[in-house]
Amino acid sequence: MYPAPDMSLWQGRIDSQEGADARRWHQWMRPYADDAEAASVLLGFASDEGVRRNQGRQGARHGPPALRRALANLAWHGEQAIYDAGDIVAGDDLEAAQECYAQRVADLLACGHRVVGLGGGHEIAYASFAGLARHLSRHERLPRIGILNFDAHFDLRHAERASSGTPFRQIAELCQASDWPFAYCCLGISRLSNTAALFDQAQRLGVRYLLDRQLQPWNLERSEAFLDGFLQSVDHLYLTVCLDVLPAAQAPGVSAPSAHGVEMPVVEHLVRRAKASGKLRLADIAELNPQLDSDQRTARIAARLVDSLVN
């Protein structure tokens, strides 16, 4: 049994005098039920154990409810259903929580839903991919899954235990064990936040990436072409946004704020472009730490990105 969602988080303004079209997220959201029609489903991963293991600043376990509160009062422009499936809560047993989240993702995908994960530290990424892989392996022997990560960090660290710095190395190992291709594209990499050893590791694994300084509005056509080339090489897409890809002025509420980063309009544009490919199967937003946020700036940006993925 999974814990029920806390629907009390979905509160906000009601503009009843404006008519039926004056809807907001909190009015449209429904708790997930097993007989729900295929739609977008929000699933939280309340964890920062991976951040702690990675020597980061804790607090991301409070990210999922903060993100729901930021979403609640946004105007709703869709017609499709949307559900809240609650949170998988991780204590200090991160590996067990990742397994539980992966199974929940696989079950939801099997029912025809598109899952949008709410983090939580970026340790959510391994759990998300494992769930997608579990689902696709039931239907395809050699699925071509693309991993699109908006992030200042490669997150390819070697460590004795899983952390927020290891998810894509874990995914690479899972792909190797399954004899699947490891198709990883990372947009927004900071040279100053990744050692030469991590760049070498990325090269060995065939990672495609663009640096934060390359992802500028004046260079958008090249960024689009780079992304399109990656999307054309895969059949299924897992998209994850680590909020530390954004400049610290826009997203202060993360464990490791970026001095440079990639501006929100560029990130949002490329997220929407990836979604428009028709290959998106699963997405998540990671590293929201409301304890470090200022005026809910990071939560509001995260909410806008979730809306871009859903509507």
UniProtKB/Swiss-Prot annotation:
Pfam families: Arginase. Its EC number is 3.5.3.8. Mn(2+) 1 binds at H122, D151, D155, C242. Pathway: Amino-acid degradation; L-histidine degradation into L-glutamate; L-glutamate from N-formimidoyl-L-glutamate (hydrolase route): step 1/1. Binds 2 manganese ions per subunit. Can also use Zn(2+). Keywords: Histidine metabolism, Hydrolase, Manganese, Metal-binding. One of its GO terms (molecular function) is manganese ion binding. GO terms for biological process: L-histidine catabolic process; L-histidine catabolic process to glutamate and formamide; L-histidine catabolic process to glutamate and formate; putrescine biosynthetic process from arginine, via agmatine. Mn(2+) 2 binds at D151, H153, C242, D244. Transmembrane segments: none annotated. InterPro entries: HutG, Ureohydrolase, Ureohydrolase_dom_sf. It catalyses: N-formimidoyl-L-glutamate + H2O = formamide + L-glutamate. Belongs to the arginase family. Catalyzes the conversion of N-formimidoyl-L-glutamate to L-glutamate and formamide. PANTHER family: ARGINASE/AGMATINASE, FORMIMIDOYLGLUTAMASE. There appear to be two competing pathways for the degradation of N-formimino-L-glutamate in P.aeruginosa: the two-step degradation of N-formimino-L-glutamate to ammonia, formate, and L-glutamate (via HutF and HutG), and the direct hydrolysis of the formimino functional group of N-formimino-L-glutamate to produce formamide and L-glutamate (via PA3175). This is Formimidoylglutamase.
